[in-house]
Amino acid sequence: MSATAISDLFEKPAQFKNKKIKLTGWLKNKRTSANIIFLEVNDGSTLLNLQAVVKQDQPELFALAESISLASAVSVSGTVALTPKSKQPLELVVKQINVLSTARADYPLQKKEHSLEFFRNNAYLRVRARTYFAIMKVRSLLSQAIFDYFFKNDFVLVHSPILTSNDCEGAGETFELKQGKEFFNKTTYLTVSGQFGAECYAQAFKKVFTFGPTFRAEKSHTSRHLSEFWMIEPEVAFANLKDLIKLIESTVKTVIKQVMQKAKQELDFLEKQFDVKLMERLKQITSTKNFHVLEYTKALEILKTAQASGQANFEVQDFNFGLDLKTEHERFLCEQHFHNQPVFVINYPKDFKAFYMKQNADGRTVGAVDLLFPQIGEICGGSEREGNLEKLVERCQAMQIDTQTLNWYLDMRKWGYFASAGFGLGFDRLLAYICGLENIRDAIPFPRAHGSINY
């Protein structure tokens, strides 16, 4: 007899009434009384455990059930009984149990409650806990939503390289490969972005996207930063800043809406765990007609006024042109000024933005955009790309960027490169927002951060 999925049982319980079935999974919980043992089994198909009942009128089976340790792998066979008056619509009346693998008594995840910090230190086991099971299921469904959106809108997927000879962002926060010079005959890094590869392919396919891991050697110890994280990076030829803003908003709203539909069970569970207003927040994002769009200079005025009036008390209070907005500023704009709504900030000073961003006519700003979210701050950043070769070279020189490894990127401008625009959306940050997580390390299976790489 092949195993039945627990998710199928809960989806259509009436179809399984009085049927003999087999389950394979793990023992998640066990309750014993004088005459009956309740085994809670999970097979990974759903967040819910199925209750399997062992009665005392089968002494050998009862004794076996009593001896099974938590986390043991089991095969359980029996007859389905409907229980419409109970919390669950059905249960399994057990006739046979096979213990496939016995978990030792020192299994770390016992019945008691564990802190999130405990789980972060035991990342290889934490997905067995319901909280992380739910988070990682949402992660999978969010990934699916990303692919569904871009394929439905005729984007071509580009597999950008992990190893690279350049620092895309020009910030110097890269991991250098120890054997790079010896093996490749030049300095080699782990990629900080798939953008450059996407730009190349956008000049052929027009609309492309990358979705993969990126690496930053930032020695940050905040709840918002990882050294290895996943990025969604679309790139569109002939697009401008207005086109980009529309694409970002459409992407974010659509994928969140799809996850809300497909991961309702998991999100309801996480709402009870972390955030009583989780679904309300997500609905507010998806139902907002248009995200607010704010000029960088206007953002400075709002922040300066808020500080002067006593509405806010920022740690960083220098609101002169050239301020790189901090998280406290970004969150104030979203949460206080715009009443918990997303905000696009556009046209930033060129001095702290990347060399490849297209300069505006004013000579001091670039066509860049950041999407700010409540509770998080920046979740997405993008720009128009500089299409003029001479201007791009001048910008590299002004920023003292060695163009030896960028010749191919510059050369693209020689042959039909009219315009391009793209953005990078932090997948893990978006997931953390959707799940109501305060620490991004809870949003990725095996978090890597400064001083922490245990697996």
Curated annotation (Swiss-Prot):
It comes from the Bacteria. PROSITE patterns: AA_TRNA_LIGASE_II (PS50862). SUPFAM superfamilies: Class II aaRS and biotin synthetases (SSF55681), Nucleic acid-binding proteins (SSF50249). It is found in: Cytoplasm. Pfam families: tRNA-synt_2, tRNA_anti-codon. Its main location: cytoplasm. InterPro entries: Aa-tRNA-synt_II, aa-tRNA-synth_II, aa-tRNA-synth_II/BPL/LPL, Asn-tRNA-ligase, Asp/Asn-tRNA-synth_IIb, NA-bd_OB-fold, NA-bd_OB_tRNA. This is Asparagine--tRNA ligase. It catalyses: tRNA(Asn) + L-asparagine + ATP = L-asparaginyl-tRNA(Asn) + AMP + diphosphate + H(+). GO terms for biological process: asparaginyl-tRNA aminoacylation. GO terms for cellular component: cytoplasm. GO terms for molecular function: asparagine-tRNA ligase activity; ATP binding; nucleic acid binding. Keywords: Aminoacyl-tRNA synthetase, ATP-binding, Cytoplasm, Ligase, Nucleotide-binding, Protein biosynthesis. Its EC number is 6.1.1.22. Homodimer. Belongs to the class-II aminoacyl-tRNA synthetase family.
